[in-house]
A protein has these predicted regions:
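Active-site nucleophile and cofactor-binding loops and adjacent substrate-binding regions
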Residues: 197-210, 226-236, 326-329, 355-360, ...
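Positively charged, low-complexity intrinsically disordered leader regions
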Residues: 110-223
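A short, small-residue-rich loop immediately preceding and capping a beta-strand
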Residues: 210, 218-257, 350-364, 384-385, ...
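Active-site-proximal loop->helix
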Residues: 227, 235-298, 394-406, 515-523
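Residue-level detector of structural "landmarks"
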Residues: 20-22, 27-32
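Short glycine/serine/threonine-rich phosphate/pyrophosphate-binding segments
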Residues: 204, 208-212, 228-246, 260-263, ...
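Cysteine-centered motifs
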Residues: 82-84
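Active-site/ligand-binding loops adjacent to catalytic centers
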Residues: 157-160, 290-328, 336, 348, ...
Length: 550
């Protein structure tokens, strides 16, 4: 049988309709034979608020004269990467993104609460001066009011995404979930490899998901502007675009080594109206202090955070916003995992292994959020792998303790895996992963054994990036390539054992502004730096002493 697709009448569309489908059967992709066959679909369903579905593209191409065999080849190659996310709404289905975001911290506190009958956060953020739990009022001097509420919220499972943010998301969401057929064929592995691609927006990464949310709450509060840090530049780019969209002032402190390595990234930020300063700088008190103590330093995310916070707290009408680490950012990034899980559930795909790069932890936390919720509730079991650079091994070689979130020791203290706030990592090319700590949420999950971590060297990372780019046609960011490296490793294990595991990883962004790094790799000028035990002990020596009983 054949499927008929037609556009809903204009009047119906204006009333909220979208693509109507008379779907009575047909053929869908058969993985065994690698032939495409449509499966039976819901009959006479009206798809509201729809993006153009893969099936409509197929119909339009067929109408344009494409041969059926060619169309089947296109569907075989693309059906698993169909960017349409399905969710139940009434009788039909909606193609779009989730209307609410999920709190990963909710499931952790609920799990811990079941064990000791107390759902309160056992490891709250601490005031850097008093070492006592921070209040909402104290956090409000640094962050926007609504973001403070989100940061301290351990009770809500979901929050509604404001309409203004949803409208912005329509520019680039939902993002594609892609079956890496060509990579599988190249590796000759029985494993199935999928990646969630977040690079299809102007920032080139997942960072825009949280940037627009934080900028929206700042604008809604009536603020003049925001300050922030950025490593490789994706977060700064995302925030500068979001602020431009909402007419907010944007002040960015960019880690010095990335500022010098990625001049075009900073020009993108300036194009969107942001001011960009290399960090550490002589424009702030904390920057001057760091320069005096570490002459010639190339900076770190911790340094840039300190400078951004100093400026935000010293200017009326400004607040600090951040690109990773804290609960509020992981919350905004949960849209990645919610879209992914909805799409995989729709096509009866269950990942065995879920992999993500980890610097501060927001993209990984967002990707695993709905899957981890199932694991914590005992409903399913997944293998989660966080991948970090060997030059900044927060999880694999760090300690689980309270530490400052920034180098200048002006930010709240968080219970996390850390190398010490004074640790300055080597100037590797994954600027977005050069952070001394890790998300408190992910740290808790790792500490409790729900997630594993691996550290990889950057030459091996770029070898994997090149291999991926040559067969999949996307030039990955250095940060994303850490996940690619481990995904390939796991696929090769399947080749050895014959296991047909399903591997999912987060492709967080593109690397088109990282060509200096690729050039050094191709010219054999890239080196691997692994901190010695002495280097790490020096960082641990600066950890604050926090009373066990708060």
């Amino acid at each position: 049988m054949k499927s008929k697709y037609f556009l809903a009448p204009i009047s119906q569309r204006a009333a909220g309709g979208g693509i109507a489908a008379d779907q009575t059967g047909g053929e869908w992709a058969s993985e065994g034979e690698r032939k495409s066959k449509y499966v039976s679909r819901r009959e006479n369903s009206v798809i509201k608020d729809a993006y153009v579905s893969m099936h409509e593209w197929m119909y339009m191409l067929h109408q344009a004269g494409w041969h059926r065999r060619s169309l089947l080849f296109i569907m075989k190659q693309t059906i698993s990467s169909c960017p349409c996310i399905l969710s139940a709404r009434g009788r039909g289905f909606s193609f779009g993104f989730p209307r609410a975001e999920r709190f990963l911290i909710y499931f952790i506190t609920k799990k811990k609460g079941e064990q000791d009958n107390d759902s309160r956060d056992k490891d709250p953020l601490l005031n850097p001066g008093t070492l006592k739990p921070l209040t909402a009022q104290e956090l409000g001097a640094v962050f926007c009011d609504e973001l403070v509420k989100q940061e301290l919220d351990n009770e809500d499972r979901y929050i509604e995404i404001p309409k203004k943010i949803r409208d912005f998301y329509k520019m680039y969401r939902p993002s594609p979930l892609v079956r890496a057929y060509c990579l599988e064929e190249k590796l000759q592995t029985p494993a199935k490899i999928y990646y969630k691609f977040e690079g299809n927006n102007t920032s080139g990464s997942h960072k825009l998901n949280s940037a627009i949310a934080q900028a929206f709450y700042a604008k809604d509060q009536g603020l003049k502007g925001v300050t922030t840090e950025t490593g490789a530049g994706q977060w700064g780019t995302a925030l500068s675009m979001a602020c431009s969209y909402l007419d907010l002032d944007c002040i960015v402190f960019m880690v010095k080594c990335s500022y010098e390595q990625k001049p075009f990234r900073r020009e993108v930020m300036r194009t969107y109206g942001a001011s960009v300063t290399p960090s550490p700088s002589d424009t702030t008190e904390v920057g001057r202090k760091i320069l005096a103590e570490h002459p010639g330093t190339t900076g770190s995310l911790g340094c840039a955070i300190s400078e951004a916070v100093e400026v935000a707290t010293g200017r009326e009408g400004y607040r600090y916003v951040l690109g990773s680490v804290l609960n509020q950012v992981v919350l905004h990034q949960s849209i990645i995992g919610l879209e992914t899980k909805t799409a995989m559930d729709k096509y009866d795909i269950r990942p065995d292994i879920i992999i993500g790069c980890a610097g501060g932890g927001s993209n990984l936390g967002g990707l695993i959020s709905p899957f981890m919720g199932e694991k914590l509730r005992g409903e399913a079991d997944y293998q989660f792998i966080a991948v970090e650079p060997a030059s900044c091994p927060s999880l694999t070689r760090g300690v689980y303790a309270y530490d400052f979130c920034d180098t200048g020791m002006v930010c709240p203290l968080a219970k996390m895996y850390t190398l010490g706030s004074g640790f300055i990592p080597s100037p590797n090319h994954a600027g977005g992963l050069r952070y001394h700590g890790m998300s408190p949420v992910l740290s808790q999950l790792y500490h409790d054994g729900f997630m594993e971590a691996r550290a990889v060297e950057q030459t091996a990372v770029f070898a994997a990036a090149e291999q991926f780019a040559r067969v999949e046609g996307i030039l990955p960011a250095p940060e994303s390539s850490h996940a690619i490296k481990v995904a390939i490793d796991e696929a090769m294990k399947c080749k050895e054992t014959g296991e047909e595991k399903t591997i999912l990883f987060g492709l967080t962004g593109t690397g088109y502004f990282d060509m200096v790094a690729y050039e050094k790799y191709h010219n054999g000028q890239m080196t691997d730096y692994i901190p010695s035990d002495e280097d790490l002990q020096a960082g641990f020596a600066g950890l604050p002493r926090v009373p066990e009983a708060l």
